[in-house]
């Protein structure tokens, strides 16, 4: 019924926002992102921790990001995001779930938020405008860094692990440093729990119950954060920096969360950062399709780039093209020997040249057909010189079609139908065999004459 449909739509429908609401923070975000770009000319990425409108905010505000929504998004990246506790789906992946570790690995140097965040040695305030704030992540790696070759091939992150556990495995594999995230406590069945931090530090939560879609976090009964749409993702919740004197309350309206609590070990994190940064790719020049820089490797290693793997990327080491491959089926990677090297990355879409050639040929053919048709209609071209197929395509009736009509008009009397009164049982009049044979013979003679003329030509 109409009433039932209306109630269902109200309960399950997807809401929309007004243009005024959608553009409410546009000028403020443009202001803070421009302030950053005016003062920092290096390569960096930035993303919104709180206040994002969509996965494509980076495209909207013209800043580089680790989020995207696209029907052709990289499946390997989406799977990697799932493993390390970041937002992902079939046709999108996003920054929700970023940690200090993934900020560093993915070159996310700046974080945008429409809420004030607690500062720490890891992240501090940079600029703000009209309710939009930018924080600088102080330990961000360049777009590429050297890793052990065995890591590039042998790393295994388990699907049944939460994102924090897999990030611990990842950092241990890349640097040899274990437990960058320190397990604090867990709440297997509680829907409402109170966390007392064991020490001051950056806190992260992992919700294992897949039926929980929304979690509310309140710090010291004053500051409240709500995290939505976590049901379909193996997502990490970034609570921010908390002190050991703080009280953190976590609640869910849908039952037990199976909540795990972790704290970032800053000393281990900084050691891991320094190890990777000591053999990182120093970018000298870059554009949307090209990077130029140097890297010094202490031994034979692999360079891992925080760039989604694509066949369009080519890597040149000391002027020679190197073989590229996909690390974890997601990121661009290339082997490099010990020593200091000039490394150049170039991007050109796969089959771009072939596509341009085919497009150009098609345009030429279409122009040719159009011009030929114009000349024919103007009577400047004799159609007799064209093959029969082309003539038919250009709407010039063949001789056979012409003579069928002519002979039919000459031999079928118009009075035949007039003599018939029963139109409900209309039947074709009988035409004697002699007339039929005459028609067929005439058609064959004309086709033979036409073929002889074309042969002579």
Sequence positions of predicted segments:
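Periplasmic/luminal catalytic loop of GT-C fold multi-pass membrane glycosyltransferases
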Residues: 88-132, 138
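Solvent-exposed loop/turn segments at secondary-structure junctions
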Residues: 52-55, 111, 117-118, 330
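Long, low-complexity, intrinsically disordered segments
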Residues: 420-457
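Active-site-proximal, structured, solvent-exposed surfaces of multi-pass membrane proteins
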Residues: 176-413, 418-421, 456-457
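Extracytoplasmic/lumenal acceptor-recognition loop(s) of multi-pass membrane glycoenzymes
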Residues: 2-23, 34-105, 139-165, 173, ...
């Amino acid at each position: 019924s109409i009433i039932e449909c209306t109630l269902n739509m109200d309960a399950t429908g997807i809401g929309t926002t007004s243009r005024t609401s959608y553009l409410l923070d546009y000028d403020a975000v443009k202001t803070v992102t421009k302030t950053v770009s005016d003062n920092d000319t290096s390569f960096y990425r930035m993303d919104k921790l709180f206040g994002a409108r969509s996965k494509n905010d980076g495209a909207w505000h013209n800043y580089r990001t680790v989020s995207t929504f696209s029907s052709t998004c990289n499946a390997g990246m989406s799977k990697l995001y799932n493993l390390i506790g970041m937002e992902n789906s079939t046709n999108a992946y996003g920054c929700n779930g970023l940690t200090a570790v993934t900020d560093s690995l993915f070159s996310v140097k700046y974080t945008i938020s429409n809420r004030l965040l607690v500062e720490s040695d890891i992240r501090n305030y940079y600029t703000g405008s009209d309710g939009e704030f930018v924080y600088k992540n102080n330990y961000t790696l360049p777009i590429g860094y050297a890793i052990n070759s065995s890591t590039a091939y042998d790393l295994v992150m388990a699907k049944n692990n939460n994102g924090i556990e897999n990030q611990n495995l990842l950092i241990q594999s890349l640097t040899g440093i274990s437990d960058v995230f320190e397990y604090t406590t867990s709440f297997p069945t509680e829907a409402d729990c109170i966390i007392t931090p064991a020490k001051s530090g950056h806190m992260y939560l992992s919700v294992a119950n897949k039926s929980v879609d929304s979690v509310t976090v309140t710090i010291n009964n004053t500051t409240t954060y709500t995290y939505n749409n976590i049901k379909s993702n193996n997502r990490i919740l970034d609570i921010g920096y908390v002190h050991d004197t703080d009280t953190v309350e976590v609640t869910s309206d849908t039952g037990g969360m199976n909540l795990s609590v972790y704290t970032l070990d800053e000393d281990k994190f900084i050691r891991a950062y320094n190890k990777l940064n000591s053999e990182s790719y120093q970018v000298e020049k870059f554009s949307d399709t090209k990077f130029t820089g140097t890297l010094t490797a202490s031994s034979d290693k692999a360079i891992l780039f925080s760039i989604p793997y694509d066949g369009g990327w080519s890597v040149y080491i000391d002027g020679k093209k190197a073989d590229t491959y996909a690390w974890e089926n997601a990121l661009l990677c290339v082997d490099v020997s010990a020593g200091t090297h000039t490394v150049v990355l170039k991007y050109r879409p796969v089959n771009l040249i072939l596509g341009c050639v085919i497009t150009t040929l098609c345009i030429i053919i279409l122009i040719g057909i159009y011009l030929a048709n114009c000349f024919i209609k103007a009577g400047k071209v004799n159609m007799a010189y064209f093959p029969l197929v082309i003539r038919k395509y250009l709407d010039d009736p063949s001789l056979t079609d012409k003579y069928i009509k002519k002979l039919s008009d000459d031999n079928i009397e118009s009075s035949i139908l007039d003599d018939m009164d029963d139109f409900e049982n209309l039947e074709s009049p009988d035409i004697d065999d002699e007339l039929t044979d005459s028609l067929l013979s005439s058609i064959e003679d004309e086709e033979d004459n036409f073929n002889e003329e074309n042969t002579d030509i």
